[in-house]
Structure formats: C-alpha cells, structure tokens
C-alpha cells in the first residue's frame, strides 16, 4: 500500500507528465501531437481523393494531354482513315466494326447528328459508352479489319459460344441454319441463310411440357411433331440454357430444359461418316446475350426491343442487319410488344441466336 501511494504521489506532484507540471517550451503536449498527426492524415486523404476524381471534373489539362497522346498514336493518314469511317459510315456499317455493335453505333450516329463530324480522335471519347481503351480497339479494328480473322483460322474457340468443336471452315460453308429455343411450354425455331435472310420463323405449343406427371413418351411425341416441320439445313443450333444448379427453385425448369435439349440432339442427329462435322450444335445463351448487350450482371434481359428494331430496319433501310420477308413482318409485328412479351420470347431468342451465329463467324 505504501509503495502504491509513493508512486502516485510522485507522478502527480513531480513527474515529467504530472498533472500540475508545465511542459518545457521546446516540447509539445501529447494531445497536440495527436492533433497534428490527425490533421496530416486528414489532409493527405483529401488530396488523394481529389487526385482520384481529377479525370472527371478538375483537370482539363490532363484531358488535353490524353487527347494529344491518343492522336499521336496514329499517323496523319491513319487518323484520316479512322475519322472518314466514323464520320460517313451508316449505323449498319458501323456495326461491322469490332465493339461498335448495338448501342455504341447508335450513339455515334446521334453524336454526329447533334455535334457535327468528329474533328479529332479525342472527340470520339465524348460518345457515350466509348472510353479510351475501347476507342483504341475500335481504331485498330478500322485500320486492320482482317487481323482477327487471320488469327482465328482453323477451329473456333467453341468454349466461347458453340459446342462441340467444329472446324471453322465447315461453319463458314453453311448456307443455312435452324436456330431452336425451348421454353416451359413451347419450342420456337428460325430458319436463316448466310445472308441473314429469315426463311421461316415459327413456334409450337407442347401440351406435355411441365404438366402433370412426366412421361418420356409424351415429350417425345410433342418434340417429334415440332421437328417434323423443319426444312433442310446445314446445322441445327440448340440454345444451351444458363440456369445455375445452385438456384434450387428453378431446378424443375432446368431438368425440363435439359430433357428437351437431349431429345432434340437425339432426334436431329444423323449417322455421319468419320471426319464429318456434327449437325446439331449448342450455342450458349449468355454468349448471345453479351453479343447484343442484353446482360445485366449475370442475368440476361429481354431482346424484344432489339428484335423490333431489326424488323423496323428491314422495312426502312436499304441494307438492314437482318432481312425479314414482308409477310413475316406483318404476321409478327405485334408479337413482341411489352404487353405480349411472354407470348413471343422464345421466338425472339431463336432469331437473335441465329443472327449472333452468323455475325460471330464474321469476327
């Protein structure tokens, strides 16, 4: 006890950090040091955050430097070729350039209409959805449109969008394909040729699908009835569903889709000679969604709006992305409105899958 009292009295009355002692003039109290440390950290944090946001608002000088760097990456002749293409190409012509499919080509045409032709390569970055890196890829694709095609000769990297492996030459020689998409109660298919002309486009109700007790014989009868109306084609393209097995609530739907997929492969496949390609192929649903910019995270949204635009362009434009016969436009023009979205979703997906197949082959 006496020892504790002695220590406390020495700290309170005589110590260097005692409560009643005044610190030397040359030293700073502990709270002052802590305050200075906090101030330095706080000011450095503000400066760092300002540096991170400078690209957006506070440093036009950096933007000018990026502009000079971007324009200096190309010769005067190359810049002229790039600007000529971007300033004069139609929307359908822009879609042939890598990374300019979908909304990017639409945004370029809108920007030209509103602000006039592009005066420099840097001005292209002002177009929505086009940033520095993607702009460089677009410029390089305009200057060297055949580079990627030369690199991809031989087999297609089918892990990207098609299974099983098929030699690229066989795919490019196809004069027409039939694209097939299965739903919970129907099967839709689209017959399209190499020129992306829709030759036929139908869907059929399947009464046995996901109703009552599953009977393989009923499934087989419904599917056989659908494929009996298929015309001749070089390849049959069956959509590969993208339902995650971890989503247990959709497990019955996944089993149903896999069952129909297996039956389609069995019924449409024919005995083939050694070395000949398979006629029935899978195409990844996610790959088609990414091709048309329909992905939101890992989920694919409806392609009805994209399809309606294709049908309108087929009537209004001289060189449309897809050519629809007039009778099919009249027959299906109201099938893809928001009020009837579920009615024609499988037909929409079947046609977009066929378009994506031929367009991906051209890359």
From Swiss-Prot:
Swiss-Prot/TrEMBL GO biological process terms: mitochondrial transcription; positive regulation of mitochondrial transcription; transcription elongation by mitochondrial RNA polymerase
Q: Where in the cell is it found?
A: Mitochondrion matrix; Mitochondrion matrix, Mitochondrion nucleoid
User: What are the entry keywords?
Assistant: Mitochondrion, Mitochondrion nucleoid, Transcription, Transcription regulation, Transit peptide
Alphabetical list of Pfam families matching this protein: HHH_3
Where mainly found? mitochondrion
Question: Phenotype of the disruptant?
Answer: Morphants show reduced movement and have abnormal neuromuscular junction morphology compared to wild-type animals.
GO MF, one term, reads: transcription elongation factor activity
Cite the SUPFAM superfamilies for this sequence. RuvA domain 2-like (SSF47781)
What would be one Gene Ontology cellular-component term for the protein?
A: mitochondrial nucleoid
- Transit peptide: first to last position: 1-23
According to its UniProt entry, the function of this protein is described as: Transcription elongation factor which increases mitochondrial RNA polymerase processivity. Regulates transcription of the mitochondrial genome, including genes important for the oxidative phosphorylation machinery.
Q: Which family is annotated?
A: Belongs to the TEFM family.
**Identification of the protein by name:** Transcription elongation factor, mitochondrial
Provenance organism: Danio rerio (Zebrafish)
Instruction: Tell me the organism's taxonomic lineage.
Output: Eukaryota, Metazoa, Chordata, Craniata, Vertebrata
